[in-house]
A protein has these predicted regions:
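Conserved hydrophobic core element of enzyme catalytic domains
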Residues: 7-134
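Short acidic, Gly/Ser-rich segments with clustered Asp/Glu that frequently serve as metal-coordination loops
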Residues: 1-6
Length: 134
């Protein structure tokens, strides 16, 4: 794990590697790992249950908190979690700005709210024309 520093936040970066049994489909591994723990909080299983209860079981997050990436022909893969992001669907006519973080038993509501606001600030500045991406 490493830490990357950005103007608004520090980002933890993890590289995960392993070996699969030849009979294991890649997509099964990817599906089993989503949503990532950095998005749900801990313990992950209970956090996911709470999220389904709060958000509704039929309330998809869309691409937010999913991943973008690829499987290569050599058996490798590279994926990035979609967190601080902005999407604009033609049918909606407005931008959706995704930002958030993991909640734990030690979380403080006000501090989590401020952290989420800081995380979305860079994306908002770009959308408002006040900044450019590094």
């Amino acid at each position: 794990m490493s830490t990357e520093e950005y103007p608004f936040v520090f980002q933890l970066v993890s590289v995960i590697s392993g070996r699969l049994l030849p009979s294991t489909p890649f997509i099964s591994v990817l599906s089993a790992s989503l949503p990532p723990g950095s998005m749900t909080g801990a313990p992950k299983k209970r956090s996911c249950e709470l999220l389904r209860h709060i958000e509704g079981s039929n309330a998809p997050r869309g691409l937010y908190s999913g991943v973008i990436g690829y499987f290569d022909v050599g058996g490798g893969a590279d994926f990035s979690v979609v967190i601080r992001s902005a999407f604009r669907w033609r049918s909606e006519g407005f931008w959706r700005n995704g930002a958030g973080g993991a909640i734990t038993a030690l979380s403080k509501v006000d501090e989590e709210w401020e952290e989420m606001r800081a995380k979305r600030e860079a994306v908002l500045q770009v959308l408002q024309g006040g900044s450019s991406l590094p």
